[in-house]
Amino acid sequence: MEFLSEKFALKSPPSKNSDFYMGTGGALEHVMETLDNESFYGKATAGKCVQAFGPLPRAEHHVRLDRTSPCQDSSVNYGITKVEGQPLHTELNRAMDGCNNLRMSPVKGMPEKSELDELGDKCDSNVSSSKKRRHRTTFTSLQLEELEKVFQKTHYPDVYVREQLALRTELTEARVQVWFQNRRAKWRKRERYGQIQQAKSHFAATYDISVLPRTDSYPQIQNNLWAGNTSGGSVVTSCMLPRDASSCMTPYSHSPRTDSSYTGFSNHQNQFGHVPLNNFFTDSLLTGTTNGHAFETKPEFERRSSSIAVLRMKAKEHTANISWAM
């Protein structure tokens, strides 16, 4: 009697006529069977529940809760009493079986690589087609004439001028603005090119290098000057210094040279740079050699030989000045 009072909180103490009364030496199984068969509802309430849900079948065993994954064991109902033959439990079992099949079967329905490439190409084509394409405008001669007239007046027309010009040329104001931008860029390019050409012409006029000997004339000079193999050298008797020089240098005699002399001449030429030689030339007279060989008296030959002699004298004078300064 004390056992039942401690384990079950009853509203009233059990009586001998009740099913829950267990006398001395009574069995506990009888009490548990009585609890299983009892509906725990009153008569009125039990009738309503039977009409709404139907008779509840007897549970044969208690629910076994498993802690494993629901995809591995289909008997887990998460606290819902498993009753055999009930539609709700049947649907749950089918769902669990489908989960097991999905877990064990390979993944299907995924697109292949070729399909993904095709989808990417379609997306790229859609993006490129959605971009605004630029159309090149072809201007007529009348339109270009009107545009050039305005450009001669001003390179930066305002909005009002552009609108009036667009009405006359039957173009949009945006097209007219773009044309003026391109025309200004073209004009600036031509201006830069003209400045470069002007600088080149000014340099050529300032530094006249037409009188300097050319490299292709060296063999001719060698053949004409040093054809005769003589022991004596020619003597330069005239003064070939600038006109404002106060005195003349002593005559400079030179002997026949080999090709190395012309190499030194080219070095001296590079040292002095492009210097006008018109002022260095005066009336020069070249005498013949001891064996009777005379130089040619052609003007071109005299000019070339005089320039060579002047450059050699300038090189010698420059060397003397450097040695005197040291």
UniProtKB/Swiss-Prot annotation:
The subcellular location is:
Nucleus
Q: Which residues carry this modification: N6-acetyllysine?
A: 131
Task: Motif OAR: list the residue ranges.
Answer: 306-319
The protein's organism comes out as: Rattus norvegicus
Q: How is it modified after translation?
A: Acetylated at Lys-131 by EP300; increases interaction with EP300 and stimulates ALX1 transcriptional activity.
Q: What is said about its interaction partners and assembly?
A: Binds DNA as a homodimer; required for transcriptional activation. Interacts (via homeobox domain) with EP300; acetylates ALX1 and stimulates its transcriptional activity.
Q: List the record's Gene Ontology CC terms alphabetically.
A: nucleus; transcription regulator complex
The free-text domain note is: The OAR motif may negatively regulate DNA-binding and therefore transcriptional activity. It is found in the C-terminal transactivation domain that stimulates transcription.
- Annotated family: Belongs to the paired homeobox family.
Its biological purpose is as follows: Sequence-specific DNA-binding transcription factor that binds palindromic sequences within promoters and may activate or repress the transcription of a subset of genes. Most probably regulates the expression of genes involved in the development of mesenchyme-derived craniofacial structures. Early on in development, it plays a role in forebrain mesenchyme survival. May also induce epithelial to mesenchymal transition (EMT) through the expression of SNAI1.
Example GO molecular function term? DNA-binding transcription factor activity
Q: Which residues carry the post-translational modification Phosphoserine, per the record?
A: 12, 69, 306
> Which Pfam families does the annotation name?
Homeodomain (PF00046), OAR (PF03826)
| One GO-annotated biological process of the protein | positive regulation of transcription by RNA polymerase II
Note the InterPro entries from the entry.
Answer: HD (IPR001356), Homeobox_CS (IPR017970), Homeodomain-like_sf (IPR009057), OAR_dom (IPR003654), Paired_Homeobox_TFs (IPR050649)
Domain of life from the UniProt record: Eukaryota
Which stretches of sequence are listed as region Transactivation domain? 192-326
Major subcellular location class? nucleus
Instruction: Cite the PROSITE patterns for this sequence.
Output: HOMEOBOX_1, HOMEOBOX_2, OAR
Return the protein name: ALX homeobox protein 1
